[in-house]
């Protein structure tokens, strides 16, 4: 069963209102912004502080995305089916029933505790002729780490790229908020 829905169906008005309300600046809550958006693509930047040093934050991001990824944003509906092989050429993959699988992205740069970069067109972007680069940068902070997600997507969109950028920003901001809550809950 394919649970990834078209971008337009990802958020209802109440869900969007809740997402906006939850995005108020709080410790450990992800704050995201569409920093550039045109008909040909967009760039998102999402930042979060976590209570773990960069090496541990990187490990939590890469070893178990199932622990923090929202299952609503998987094809199988089960986050535990996600794996991330955090080395160059490694797959951010999902297994499904009947032997089916999906590659959500390929690792193109891995430097534990510093940077993880994937080539990826996430969710509904996968079926469009677009190219995406998703980077996670880790910087030490006195109380842990500052993690910055940058997602650049460009190409031939089959839907309005400006509208899609807002939906993708909302979903990835939610994911980073879940990541921060997961890491911060490991005190």
Predicted regions and their residues:
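Hydrophobic-ligand binding "helix-grip"
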Residues: 31, 69, 82-83, 98-144, ...
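Short beta-edge strand/loop motif at the mouth of beta-sheet-based domains
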Residues: 64-104
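A conserved amphipathic terminal alpha-helix motif
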Residues: 3, 31, 146, 150-187
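Bacterial N-terminal signal peptides that target proteins for export
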Residues: 2-16
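Bacterial N-terminal signal peptides
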Residues: 12-27
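Sec/Tat-exported extracytoplasmic proteins
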Residues: 54, 61-65, 69, 88, ...
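Hydrophobic pocket/interface hotspot
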Residues: 57-61, 92, 107, 118, ...
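Hydrophobic ligand-binding cavity/cleft-lining segments
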Residues: 28-79
């Amino acid at each position: 069963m394919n649970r990834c829905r078209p971008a337009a169906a990802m958020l209802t008005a109440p869900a969007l209102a809740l997402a906006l309300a939850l995005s108020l600046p709080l410790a450990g809550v992800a704050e995201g912004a569409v920093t550039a958006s045109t008909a040909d693509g967009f760039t998102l930047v999402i930042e979060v502080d976590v209570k773990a040093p960069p090496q541990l934050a990187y490990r939590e991001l890469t070893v178990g995305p199932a622990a923090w990824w929202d299952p609503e944003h998987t094809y199988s509906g089960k986050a535990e089916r996600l794996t991330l092989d955090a080395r160059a050429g490694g797959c951010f993959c999902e297994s499904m029933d009947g032997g089916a699988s999906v590659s959500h992205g390929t690792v193109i740069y891995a430097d534990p505790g510093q940077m993880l970069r994937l080539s990826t067109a996430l969710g509904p972007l996968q079926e469009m002729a677009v190219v995406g680069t998703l980077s996670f940068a880790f910087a030490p902070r006195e109380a842990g780490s500052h993690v910055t997600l940058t997602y650049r997507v460009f190409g031939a969109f089959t839907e309005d790229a400006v509208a899609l950028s807002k939906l993708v920003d909302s979903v990835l901001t939610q994911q980073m908020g879940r990541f921060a809550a997961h890491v911060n809950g490991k005190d």
